[in-house]
Amino acid sequence: MRGTRKYQHVIETPDPGKWELAGYEESLPISEKSNPMTRELDKADPSQLVQLLRDCDAEIFQEEDENLIHYHRLYSESVLKTMGDVAKRVQEVLKNPDDSLVVLSGCGTSGRLALLLANSFNGLLKGLHKTPCYCYIMSGGDRSIVTSQESSEDNPQLGAQELEKVCEGKKNVLFIGISCGLSAPFIAGQLDFCMRHLDVYLPVLVGFNPVSMARNERIEGWHSSFRQVAERLQTLHDSQKGFILNPAVGPEGVSGSSRMKGGSATKILLETLLLVAHKAESNVPVTEKCLLEILRTYERAHKVTYSQSKKIAALMKQTATSLQKKGHLYILGWGTLGLVGIMDAVECVPTYQADWRDVRGFITGGYHSIENKEGDLSSLGPQFSISHEDFVKNVLPSVSETDTVLLIFTLDDDLNQIEKLVALVKEKTSNIQVICHATAGQYLPNSLKKTIPSIIGLTWPILFLEYEGAFIQKFQRELSTKWILDTVTSGAYTLRGKIFRNFMVDFKINNSKLFHRATSVLQRLTGQSHQRCTEVLLQSIYGEQTLSEQIRNTTIAGHVEAAASQDKVLPVAIVSLLRSCTIQDSRSRINSSLSIRSAIESSMNVPGRKRGAEDSESR
Ligand code: F1P
């Protein structure tokens, strides 16, 4: 442990990683760097995978190290101070709920978290018979709750329009824009809109890169880059007319997968800040101590969660086996834990090119429990059926021994109903697993215990804190569930050969960020120039060896649209570059390989191949 640590930590956070050293993958922002800890993620077995991802998650709580690059961390004084400053401004909104609003906005996982958080704090207010004053925006609208709609993320104008719409008639709006990578144009558009109307709006940006690492290419069809917007926002900091909350939490265990640490850190940071603001309303002043007290409960949650590592590894192994046999993972959650399950399932589609049926989430009460703005979306198609009734009616009849069913609940939920569902599922598959949250002193009834072969049991301490105490426990359970599911699904897809080293190599290129990520992964794995990598990526997207002038002159948005109808775009480009073979040859090689990973691995060892940058740097 380092001597510089200021706080007594609940968990043992790892020592600073090599990624903090100057020059480490210098051209990449932290959120896109490859984590040195997980370089051999693809070779790990389930227990090692859990351990590696556990250590990556622990980096969220690591402190700033003055001997290294001066990255601000969650516990840095400047970050705690900004959290306190924003909390005080939230308090002002809470005092005048009629013409004020707190808007939380994000894309993908960040948008789903905006929904979860807005509902939590509206629930907190309603419980006190106060007016709800939170609202959420997610790019792509409510359909993005259950499906991935990554392309709307690229539209800054749309972001601004949506914001204007939800704030109509309000005199005081605190806007919280979440973009883990400081990258989403949708959020840039909203921040820019706020900065043009500072009489009404207070813009707050949440993400996990320094401003100097925010995305720097000019947004297509717009006037600025994300970085320029963030820099403008930074200048408002001293006058308290705008804030940026961007502690470094380290690179993701799976490079670029911001749903993981980025999502967890968003939840930790914002829930802490908002809870303190609500406490402060009851005349408790906003202090660093209040913030630290809550942050520590999340550290404790990390410890409690990963005390179940063995069982998490078993669930991961079971899930990987199901997926390998063309089976499924069905996640059935109660209350907000159901939403956490849906969040995790949805992201498997863009991150691993999974079919939407492979991993699915269901929630008790369906849309009614989610409390989304657009109400019941189930008429939009089978993908949008998310209630337990939908599962029983439409999915259960075809469940078989190859499928895994995971139930997630707390001991305060309807245990009779759970027991009945367990019995129904057991008629179809013996692969039934449970994540069960209890408060100290509560026990799972024997009747349930006997029927479920494998239980991940998490017991949370009783928190003797006024009304908010119950919310802290809810937040801990949600985060703990998120950590387990992130680890299980990322690990299962790693075991299925969807990861090479720690790079996602088979993701959907459905927005500009992902287009750039694809080129960057190509460069890192092959050591070839940016220009050459872009060329081969385009060959793979269009399935043409010779690129026409028209293709070369197409915008990135156009390439993204073309990529939408193709599968395995990135793996085909990687193998084609490594083997100097045609796109067609590469595709047939991949199609006849055991996995994407094995196709890349065998291409790495082709005689005479030029060594890649990654090879020489660290292997
Ligand atoms: C937004 C996001 C992620 C998702 C995927 C694509 O990222 O939709 O939530 O996991 O990586 O991007 P960000 O704007 O929060 O960085």
Swiss-Prot record:
Binding residue positions for beta-D-fructose 1-phosphate: T109, S110, E153, S179, C180, G181, E347, K513
Alphabetical list of InterPro entries matching this protein: GKRP_SIS_2, Glucokinase_regulatory_CS, MURQ/GCKR, SIS_dom, SIS_dom_sf
Organism superkingdom: Eukaryota
Pfam families for this protein: GKRP-like_C, GKRP_SIS_2, GKRP_SIS_N
Keywords: Carbohydrate metabolism, Cytoplasm, Mitochondrion, Nucleus, Repeat
UniProt-recorded Gene Ontology molecular function terms: carbohydrate binding; enzyme binding; fructose-6-phosphate binding; glucose sensor activity; kinase inhibitor activity
Region called Essential for interaction with GCK, residue ranges: 462-464
Protein name: Glucokinase regulatory protein
Annotated gene: gckr
